[in-house]
Amino acid sequence: MKPSTSTRARVRAAFVLCLLLLSSVSRAAAQQAAQQAATLPVEKVKQIEALVGAEMAKQKIPGMTVAVVSERRVRWAAGFGMQDIENNVAAKPATVYRLGSIAKPITAVAAMQLFERGKLDLDAPVQKYCPAFPEKQWPVTTRQVLGHLAGIRHYKSDDEFNSTRFYASVAEGLNMFKDDPLLSEPGTKYNYTTHGYSVLGCVVEGASGQKFADFVNENVFRPAAMERIRVDSVADIIPNRAQGYRVTDKGVLTNSPLADNSYKVPGGGFVSTAEDLARFAVALQTDRLLKRETLELMYAPQKTKDGKETSYGLGWGVAKRPTGERTVGHSGGQQRVSTFLHMQPDQGLAVVIMSNLEGARLGALAQQIGDIVLK
């Protein structure tokens, strides 16, 4: 006896339902396995938590977020303490902090992308791309700006550093320093300079034909899957933004003063999360933003004209640990925050620390966390 049409339909429906259930279970199992693979072992997490807690207590840091990259994947992120004491808001992976000078490697990556594409000559005078920066007593090149060898000055005073004025563009921000003479002949001395990176941002605009923020959004942030990063603004409502603090000479914790970073977006004017910066590290280590040979060029210590190595590459602080591993990274410090991005590219490691205390010392902590991860 042949099964009826309705019976065959019920059998087919049951079969399809079974397949859907099996597929759902398989996807869930795969997702669970992926989540487990993307996390650190519990014992390492406990060690990191204890280390972070002790350091926060020692330095009186109100809030902190840490993210870890291992085997070139984001493995773990967590918040500690308070992102906002007055409103009793705990720090978390989604807490948004100012980056400080970690903006510099981002801008350097943008410049080196243009170099790879043949749009930027690192050894041409910067005025070829940034005519808004006047010619000086000596020629200045983009390579020298990248390595802090251009002789462009840093902050002149606390009033300048604590500026509350809004600057509408990268070129307008140059007005703060562009007419000042160079501190030294380019190539002869290492002079760390945030203002120099404003010139670099102007170079990126000239070489790309785009506004600086648009270029980094399209060419750095999107390919790296950085979802929360944006140009800082004291006026905009930015969800999950951390309040910032400082400790006075008498040891009293106070709110940070207002400061507008619009004059230095390329060198210190972004906000984001620790997870975003971890994704930036992953994108670099997996060659999604630049070719490997370009990264090696950036990670090589620059030299002054007399042949002496500096501790800075093209946009990155570079060093070797006593055990021989090379490290690449950058610190950040400004009103409201202290930050650190530590990478050991040969080991596929990165540690990001973002805190809401000015003047916090985070470099040693980042290395110690990295040592725990690599054990």
Whereabouts are the PLM-identified features?
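Short active-site loop at a secondary-structure junction
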Residues: A57-A67, E86-Q144, S184-H195, V265-G268, ...
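Boundary at the C-terminal end of the N-terminal hydrophobic targeting segment
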Residues: A28-A30
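Bacterial N-terminal signal peptides that target proteins for export
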Residues: K2-F15
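Short, gly/Ser/Thr-rich active-site loops of penicillin-recognizing serine hydrolases
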Residues: L357-K375
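Short, well-ordered beta-strand elements
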Residues: G329-H330, T339-L357
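Bacterial N-terminal signal peptides
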Residues: A13-S24
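Short, surface-exposed loop or secondary-structure junction motifs
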Residues: F80-D84, Q137-Q334, T339
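Short, conserved catalytic-motif segment at the N-terminal edge
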Residues: L40-Y97, K119-A124, K178-D179, L253-T254
